[in-house]
Amino acid sequence: MKIVIAPDSFKESLSAVSVAACIEKGFREIFPDADYVTLPLADGGEGTVDVLLQGLAGQKRTHQVEGPLGALVNAEWAMLEPSEYNQNKTALIEIAAASGLDLLKPEQRDPLVASSFGTGQLILEAIEQGAQTIILGLGGSATNDGGAGIVQALGGRLLDSKVQDDDGQELNRGGAALAELASIDLTGLDSRCADVELIVACDVDNPLCGDNGASHVFGPQKGATPDQVLILDKALANFAQIAESQGCVGGDDPVHKRTGYGAAGGTPMGLGLLFNMQIKPGIEMVLDVLQADEVLKGADLVITGEGQMDNQTLQGKTPYGIAKRASLQGIPTIGIAGSLGTEVEALYGEMSSLFGTVRSPQSLDQVLQEAEKNLTRTARNIAATLKLGRKILS
């Protein structure tokens, strides 16, 4: 029996590699002689660089940048060697490495002031090192600033409405400040940006603004209160309106409605002012690089998972992506999550069954501390149930 274990990370607790190891350990208690193939995955969020380096030759590097609240952090990125996949000198960057939620303690999270400036510094470093193409993974950000910090780091000026001279004053960093935006000055932008191809690996398809936009859907997990969600949504809408009125963005469709622009607190909004940008589903990119379709051939079962599965999983997350690939080959998929959330039943179209690992009410700290034990136990119990089913049917 061939079992492919292809999970994402469990946010704030286990890496994708650790998740795969726990699942294999649990299954081996029941099926010790099965053929196990582990395929740790990512969809543009945390761990994307490490996962892509499984299939592409490259070197990891470290650069000191400003974190989401300004404190210095050592952020990892990678430069790829030329290959069939990447003809140009290509950099791999995660927004989570410089502007990530995991860089802050829960009580520090504040999307009103958190900035993507450090991610802009990483992009600038990659350009300095000769990158012609940049693959930027969006996911796990602490920010809701529409990529404004990136614009500022690369030489753009965002000017407020409190005019003290003809130009106005530069905005403070953070999402809330965008409510005061009156004009955008890109004359000081690093000229090399025009020659860089930017590929955004995105794990959601939400628009920039509105009830399904960046602030309403993802703001609360970054620390936003209901009132702050409204402030942030209006601020992003103002950013989009100013950019459109000044002709800073191309295309006929309204910026605030564009698919994927709600990723990472609206980061594609700012990126679109600076680069020749393509937005691609991060999981599809990762699956192609790792030749997942070949790995799946001959498999009897796929097991995937992430920290939480809910209706957002359908919008470009790892479990749904690998389950669709498995379904095309007639392979059943089982999903394991720390918790099963809103409208998770929608996943039954691609997954045979879903399991949560938390068995009793616990504090978040306790859930995170016991993630490895809970996951291994759940995997073991799933395997035991499968074995019982085979016995009953034989």
Task: Indicate where each model-derived feature is located.
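N-terminal loops that bind phosphate or other acidic moieties
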Residues: 1-138, 142-394
